[in-house]
Amino acid sequence: MKKITIVSSKKYIRSSQFKSLIETLDSKKIVYQYIDLDKTEEDFEINSDSIILGLGGDGTALRAMKLGWINKAPVLNIGSGRVGYLVNSLEDIDLTSLLSKTNQKHLKPRTPIIQNQETNSPAFNEIVIIKNSPTRLLDLEIHTYEQKVKLRADGIIISTSLGSTAYNYSAGGPIVQTSMNTLIITPISPFTKFPRSIVLDKESSIKIKVAKNQNYSIQFDGIESISRISNEDEYYEYLLSEDNLDVFYEKDIPKLDLFLNQILR
């Protein structure tokens, strides 16, 4: 039986779901430790022999996935009911069976986007380049397939298939089946003419040029952000990593019923 590292925040500690989870782990004599996401200054030892168990919503799931990526440990995300797109319902899974061994049929590879070959800041949903000034557009240039397109917009989203129902969709992008493993380029409030989105194959590389004198931020899954002021043209390359993160899923099907119920309210 592997050691469990529970990743959550204070508001979930008080939930009945957290209590039920702890009771299950205690009854099976499963060794576990707890990481409080509200206390990011603490150092925790996580190794590849652990299973990271994220308890919460999609934000918690993404943070758990980043921890899993950095520590090369598989991840199981659990949320309340069917609220989240990235989480399993505790009622729908056999937790003991999943955690007793690494059952290959329940492991699904998730491939993040990486920036400039930097693997410590993976993005499993999307990377966003967005303006910091409310009144000034960004001047961007997109390079892919040995072609380039200029774009003036509030920003740009580079999304995975997994993240296609997140910010990508809010900005008018398409929903893509997660198993397709694509890259999606979607502009944010474009001023110049630009397709609503461009869907690229998994082997594609995207280079973005941000013109000089731009005030902008780069956001990774909404949980990490870097602010920049460009004194000269700046270039960023985005591609899908050659490595994957193993994530436990009881049912690897898109939650279209959940998604459509949300947007048709």
What are these regions (language model features)?
Residues S121, I129, P134, Y145-K148, ...:
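ATP/nucleoside-binding phosphotransfer catalytic cores, i.e., glycine-rich phosphate-binding loops
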Residues M1-I51, L55, R63-I70, L90-H106, ...:
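ATP/NTP phosphate-donor binding region
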Residues S16, R63-M65, L86-N88, D139, ...:
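Short glycine-/acidic-enriched loop or helix-start segments at secondary-structure transitions
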Residues K150-F194:
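Gly/Ser/Thr-rich active-site loops/lids in small-molecule metabolic enzymes
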Residues R63, L67-S80, Y85:
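Gly/Ser-rich helix-loop-strand patches that form or flank binding pockets
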Residues W69-A73, E91-L95, G172-N181:
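A glycine- and small-aliphatic-rich helix-loop capping segment at beta-alpha/alpha-beta transitions
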Residues G57-T60, G81, L162-T165:
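Short glycine-rich anion-binding loops that position phosphate/pyrophosphate groups of nucleotides
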Residues G81-G155:
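Catalytic core of DAGKc-family lipid kinases
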